[in-house]
């Protein structure tokens, strides 16, 4: 059984920033960056260019930013483990963390596990149907696949993520359709203007994909218009979901207070959770801002809160 003063679960901007601050405070943190549960480095690993992170006037690729943060955390003594924490016991002291058959203990814990992309429950989108055979939730991860080249592609969603995915896919697809169930977008004006100016992007308003069909790969979709109540079949090679995220909190087993959507509840103005010694940072506790810079800031808060807790 391995013991650490501080364990950080998660490896996005929140987790790495917490590790930087904690290691500089000589807390020798152990950071579990994940393995099977999701890509190490969090959602920014699937983002192309990040243009709004301070200090990079020309922008920076998401994975490069995460690599830099990881290197900085390790420079100050953070131990990074490519393992998943699958269960926790916060009812005992020290806390007990499970990773497969391994057991770890810690005096304080920062949860920075982020959130995962949601998927539509429609015919053809299941794991045993066309998931990863033309249906995905990450254009950056999968968009360059040969199956999408010079084909009609469809992005479901109306926020910034949906438009970013659509613009990325114009590099590969013949046409990219943004399918939105309303007649206005939630995305920022800057993103809307960019997408509307792209001659390869088209918008299907008041529309919903109700079925995905194909053989070994996606070949077509059925689109329902919720205004005129008609259904149209269109050729398609790819369907990309960009409809929001689900916080990665299931492994906590209800031991930390969550809101109705599964996000960790933290005390106002702090990273403290309902369990003393357990702190939360990043998108796992933030459903409003969801930015790399705010995640990093909350990671700093969590490290400082953990340091004060351990001192007392």
From Swiss-Prot:
Its main location: cytoplasm. Its EC number is 1.8.1.9. GO terms for cellular component: cytoplasm. One of its GO terms (biological process) is cell redox homeostasis. The keyword Flavoprotein applies. It comes from the Bacteria. It is found in: Cytoplasm. Transmembrane segments: none annotated. The active site is a redox-active disulfide bond. Homodimer. Belongs to the class-II pyridine nucleotide-disulfide oxidoreductase family. This is Thioredoxin reductase. It comes from Chlamydia trachomatis serovar D (strain ATCC VR-885 / DSM 19411 / UW-3/Cx).
């Amino acid at each position: 059984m391995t013991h650490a003063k501080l364990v950080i679960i998660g490896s996005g901007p929140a987790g790495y920033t917490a590790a930087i601050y904690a290691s500089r405070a000589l807390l020798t943190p152990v950071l579990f960056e994940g393995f099977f549960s999701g890509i190490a480095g969090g959602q920014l690993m699937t983002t192309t260019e990040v243009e709004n992170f301070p200090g990079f006037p020309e922008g920076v690729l998401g994975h490069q930013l995460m690599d830099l943060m990881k290197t900085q955390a390790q420079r100050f003594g953070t131990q990074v483990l490519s393992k998943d924490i699958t269960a926790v016991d916060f009812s005992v002291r020290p806390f007990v963390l499970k990773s497969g058959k391994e057991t770890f203990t810690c005096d304080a814990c920062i949860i920075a596990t982020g959130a995962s992309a949601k998927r539509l429950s429609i015919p053809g989108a299941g794991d045993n149907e066309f998931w990863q055979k033309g249906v995905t939730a990450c254009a950056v991860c999968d968009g360059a696949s040969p199956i999408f080249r010079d084909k009609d592609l469809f992005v479901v969603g109306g926020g910034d993520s949906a438009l970013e995915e659509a613009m990325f896919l114009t590099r590969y697809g013949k046409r990219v359709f943004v399918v939105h169930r309303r007649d206005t977008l939630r995305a920022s004006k800057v993103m809307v203007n960019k997408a509307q100016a792209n001659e390869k992007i088209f918008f299907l308003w008041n529309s919903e994909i109700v079925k995905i069909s194909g053989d070994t790969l996606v070949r077509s979709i059925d689109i329902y218009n919720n205004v005129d109540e008609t259904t149209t079949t269109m050729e398609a090679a790819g369907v990309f979901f960009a409809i929001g995220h689900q916080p990665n909190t299931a492994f906590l087993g209800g031991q930390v207070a969550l809101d109705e959507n599964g996000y960790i509840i933290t005390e106002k103005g702090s990273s403290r959770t309902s369990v003393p010694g357990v702190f939360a940072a990043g998108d796992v506790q933030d459903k409003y801002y969801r930015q790399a810079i705010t995640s990093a800031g909350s990671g700093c808060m969590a490290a400082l809160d953990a340091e004060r807790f351990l001192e007392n």
